[in-house]
């Protein structure tokens, strides 16, 4: 007589959902960092390899997907890029506005004693926009090597339109190459639990969170504002678009995109994850192959919050009065700066001096604010990236679902 044994914990995890495997990796990473710091630092290599693999595959994935979708686009077939772009810009401005309200409700101050003399921020918003435009005319090989997604998008779109006039064999080859790269991406994503395990272990072992307690209130305002945008503002925008309960979609995007982005701390590395989620949601490939890399470049709600909150914290510290029109102008400036954050080395933090300049704050003090940003960066950057990246796929899904509903209603009326 044979007896049936219930599958063990390891077997259940191995054959369970990827989210459960990531949660297991997270818990094991925390335990290892608590038990042995040297061992935790050593397994950090696993996290570095995982993030490196995602960053390596993301540029070629964007190039091939966008090129294939445009080359094989059928005449008359509609994409939803325009409404998604509008949602990106509206979401970023709404986040900056929420950050202003949050900062007025819970004013924070800083200990401006750190220095950051070795960092060179852009001198003005014109320089930020110039860098963004110049990245469009980058050499394609250089764009792929450096992960310049604006340049990659421009070349992919141009080549895609050119290949529309090619023969079917060429189009099929491009499509097959796109599928091959997608397969490689899925392979890399399967190693996410191991990567998260390494990232969490090394972060807790090398950095810890003791330095963050000195900036507890500032972090509460920053993270609280990001949670407000993720769980209140974004759902309102999605409801406005799809006219039904937005929370199943919002929570799905936070769980399956935001969790990855929180630990990788890279919107570029999360592009393959978002692409896979869009495929899982059965969204239009012609749309998401363009909107996801575009969102990783310009959809920066988290960056807008960081710029606004830290700037107003500096303003409060120096006792500078701020009226309502100035606060609204700061929201606009923070939104524009956030959209250009991908074109600046150091991202949102190095755009803080631009916003500080509005209030006549000297560059020396502004750079001390940037230094504070780097101190709290362990948590701030993780939350910012999670919000930015999950919003890319959220707004893409909302626009695609709204278009599907419109077509279905139109078919019923006819």
Swiss-Prot record:
Ranges that cross the membrane: 16-36, 46-66, 84-104, 143-163, 180-200, 218-238, 300-320, 332-352
Task performed by this protein: Involved in the import of serine and threonine into the cell, with the concomitant import of sodium (symport system).
One GO process term, biological-process aspect: serine transport
Matching PROSITE patterns: NA_DICARBOXYL_SYMP_1 (PS00713)
GO cellular component: plasma membrane
Family per record: Belongs to the dicarboxylate/amino acid:cation symporter (DAACS) (TC 2.A.23) family.
Membrane topology: Multi-pass membrane protein
Highest taxon above the source species: Bacteria
Record topological domains on the Periplasmic side: 37-45, 105-142, 201-217, 321-331
Protein name as catalogued: Serine/threonine transporter SstT
GO MF annotation terms: neutral L-amino acid:sodium symporter activity
Biological classification of the source: Bacteria, Pseudomonadati, Pseudomonadota, Gammaproteobacteria, Enterobacterales
Cytoplasmic side: 2-15, 67-83, 164-179, 239-299, 353-414
Record field: catalytic activity: L-serine(in) + Na(+)(in) = L-serine(out) + Na(+)(out); L-threonine(in) + Na(+)(in) = L-threonine(out) + Na(+)(out)
Location within or outside the cell: Cell inner membrane
Keyword Transmembrane helix in annotation: yes
Keywords: Amino-acid transport, Cell inner membrane, Cell membrane, Membrane, Symport, Transmembrane, Transmembrane helix, Transport
């Amino acid at each position: 007589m044979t007896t049936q044994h219930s599958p063990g914990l390891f077997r259940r995890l191995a054959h369970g959902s990827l989210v459960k495997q990531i949660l297991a990796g997270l818990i094991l990473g925390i335990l290892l960092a608590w038990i042995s710091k040297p061992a935790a630092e050593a397994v950090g290599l696993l996290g570095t390899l995982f993030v490196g693999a995602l960053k390596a595959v993301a540029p070629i994935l964007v190039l091939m997907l966008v090129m294939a979708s445009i080359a094989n686009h059928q005449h008359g077939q509609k994409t939803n890029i325009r409404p998604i772009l509008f949602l990106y810009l509206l979401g970023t401005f709404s986040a900056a506005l929420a950050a202003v309200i949050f900062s007025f409700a819970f004013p924070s101050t800083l200990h401006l004693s750190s220095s950051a003399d070795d960092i060179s921020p852009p001198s003005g918003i014109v320089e930020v926009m110039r860098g963004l435009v110049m990245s469009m005319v980058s050499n394609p090989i250089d764009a792929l090597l450096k992960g310049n997604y604006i340049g990659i998008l421009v070349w992919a779109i141009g080549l895609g339109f050119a290949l529309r006039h090619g023969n079917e064999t060429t189009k099929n080859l491009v499509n097959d190459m796109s599928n091959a790269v997608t397969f490689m991406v899925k392979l890399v994503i399967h190693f996410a639990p191991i990567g998260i395990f390494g990232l969490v272990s090394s972060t807790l072992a090398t950095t810890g969170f003791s330095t963050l307690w000195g900036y507890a209130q500032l972090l509460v305002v920053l993270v609280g504002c990001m949670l407000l945008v993720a769980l209140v503002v974004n759902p309102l925008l999605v409801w406005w678009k799809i006219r039904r309960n937005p929370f199943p979609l919002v929570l799905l995007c936070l769980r399956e995109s935001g969790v990855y982005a929180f630990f990788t701390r890279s919107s570029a590395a999360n592009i393959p994850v978002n692409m896979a989620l869009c495929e899982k949601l059965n969204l239009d490939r012609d749309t998401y192959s363009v909107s996801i890399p575009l969102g990783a470049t310009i959809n920066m709600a988290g960056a807008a919050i960081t710029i606004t909150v830290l700037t107003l914290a500096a303003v409060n510290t120096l006792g500078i009065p701020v009226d309502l029109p100035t606060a609204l102008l700061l929201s606009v400036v923070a939104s524009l700066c956030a959209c250009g954050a991908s074109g600046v080395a150091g991202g949102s933090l190095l755009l803080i001096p631009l916003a500080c300049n509005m209030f006549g704050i000297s560059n020396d003090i502004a750079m001390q604010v940037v230094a504070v940003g780097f101190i709290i960066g362990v948590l701030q950057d993780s939350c910012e990236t999670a919000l930015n990246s999950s919003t890319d796929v959220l707004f893409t899904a909302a626009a695609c679902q709204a278009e599907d509903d419109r077509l279905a209603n139109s078919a019923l009326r006819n």
